[in-house]
């Protein structure tokens, strides 16, 4: 088993090493945009990328809610900037559509269901997968990267630390090993891959900025979007799963670095204050149910 896992990792590394594109302007020292001078993205759409039922809420709220089930949303976001489009995460695999058994990253803990496909939602506003310039990944858990392979012509943006993590040898935690193996399978070998080292100004004008928020995974990131009428919006990724995490500084047990997670939450708090930004939390179903859904949009 260990030999097979090592062989799979080496094959993944060999394939990816041939495919990495040149970098965006992206380093740990890149400054976040000036709130008064940042450009604007035209539109921000929320896409329904699945929903899930977990059997123990305490995994996400340590010390509380033992054995209580909880439902999560899975959200993707689509951003228009001029003639270009950026897709933030790709959600649960389309193969899970209407499957009564669902799909899972960790079958003993959580099951995901899908009611509509990503491609159908794009088609509803006249887009094809080939119209998407960038696919930016908050991190590599399967419910966020399930459809990356539908976008072979898009440039995939992810943190170098995240790529290194899923490429690393297995450790003692079986859940983590399982998540990393699934990530390698779902990511495959993108034709265009850019590995980032920290924050990145995607379009060069401060309208859309990838923000390094490690902790949940080593290369987790969030997204800062600037819109003319809606102002600044932060798309959380999994820096938090629930508003309660943010309010209480609670870090889910399924996490790679608790201290880094708390530091990342603090960073998001500072950004909210600096930009007077709204925070949209990916998995918080109560919040997601109140947000606009494609074809409606934020501008």
Language model feature labels by segment:
Residues 10-21:
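Bacterial N-terminal signal peptides
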Residues 22-131, 160-212, 229-237, 260-276, ...:
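Metallo-beta-lactamase
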Residues 49-50, 90-92, 140, 161, ...:
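Active-site metal-binding loops of divalent metal-dependent hydrolases
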Residues 1-12:
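Bacterial N-terminal signal peptides that target proteins for export
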Residues 46, 69, 76-80, 86, ...:
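Core dinuclear metal-dependent hydrolase active-site scaffold
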């Amino acid at each position: 088993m260990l030999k097979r896992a090592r062989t799979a990792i080496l094959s993944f590394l060999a394939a990816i090493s041939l495919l990495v594109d040149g970098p965006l302007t992206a380093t740990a020292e890149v400054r976040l945009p000036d709130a008064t001078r940042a450009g604007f993205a035209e539109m921000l759409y929320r896409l329904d990328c699945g929903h899930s039922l977990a059997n123990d809420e305490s995994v996400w709220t340590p010390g509380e809610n033992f054995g209580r089930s909880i439902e999560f949303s899975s959200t993707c976001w689509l951003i228009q900037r001029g003639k270009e489009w950026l897709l933030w995460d790709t959600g649960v695999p389309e193969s899970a559509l209407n499957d009564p058994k669902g799909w899972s990253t960790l079958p003993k803990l959580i099951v995901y269901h899908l009611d509509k496909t990503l491609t159908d939602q794009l088609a509803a506003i006249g887009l094809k997968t080939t119209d998407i310039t960038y696919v930016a990944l908050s991190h590599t858990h399967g419910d966020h990267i399930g459809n990356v392979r539908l976008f072979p012509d898009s440039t995939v943006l992810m943190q170098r630390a995240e790529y290194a993590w899923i490429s690393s040898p297995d450790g003692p935690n079986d859940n983590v090993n399982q998540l990393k193996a699934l990530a390698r399978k779902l990511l495959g070998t993108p034709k265009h891959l850019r590995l980032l080292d920290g924050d990145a100004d995607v379009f060069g004008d401060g309208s859309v900025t990838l923000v390094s928020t490690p902790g949940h995974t080593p290369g987790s990131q969030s997204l800062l979007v600037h819109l003319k009428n809606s102002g600044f919006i932060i798309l959380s990724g999994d820096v938090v799963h629930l508003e309660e995490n943010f309010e209480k500084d609670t870090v889910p047990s399924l996490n790679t670095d608790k201290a880094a997670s708390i530091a990342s939450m603090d960073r998001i708090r500072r950004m909210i204050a600096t930009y007077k930004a709204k925070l949209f939390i990916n998995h918080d179903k109560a919040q997601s149910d109140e947000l606009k859904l494609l074809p409606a949009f934020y501008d």
